[in-house]
């Protein structure tokens, strides 16, 4: 949902809902090109989807999050960042790392702004896990990336799901 038209499509059914309990901003894209050839279009595509869409979709859906959020059981927003927003990636994905660093900072700003409205905002910054995006970069051979991890493996969808469930549950309300 990185353009105004796409955001409108994402929220077209918003009026059918009385409230939402949580929002998970999980859309993301990467772009890899050598430094000297890195295109403005690739940069903009990544920044628009990874950062801009999070802000504007959150802005549009905040009224529905405010409805049921209480001091004891706030509504939740989870933004999916990346370790590449904190570390320098091995690939020439300049806009990806910058966008995920922006997601982490935007998360802190939104958390500060929305807490008084009983909306908690957190980010998950996963390491590598099987995905079309990473798979394309490594020809779906994750063995070298796994070797760089102290656990000698890459993450799984269940690793991410467990944390998201915790953050959206009553256990993550404080």
Please give the residue ranges for each predicted region.
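Single conserved hydrophobic/aromatic residue that forms the stacking wall/gate
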Residues: 1-7, 11-13
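Substrate-binding pocket helix/loop in short-chain dehydrogenase/reductase
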Residues: 34-35, 42-47, 134, 145
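Alpha-helical segment proximal to the catalytic Tyr-Lys
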Residues: 63, 112-116, 173
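Residue(s) in the substrate-gating loop at a strand-loop-helix junction
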Residues: 82
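A glycine/serine/threonine-rich, flexible loop-to-helix segment
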Residues: 92, 116, 123-149, 159
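C-terminal substrate-recognition "lid" of short-chain dehydrogenase/reductases
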Residues: 119, 153-174
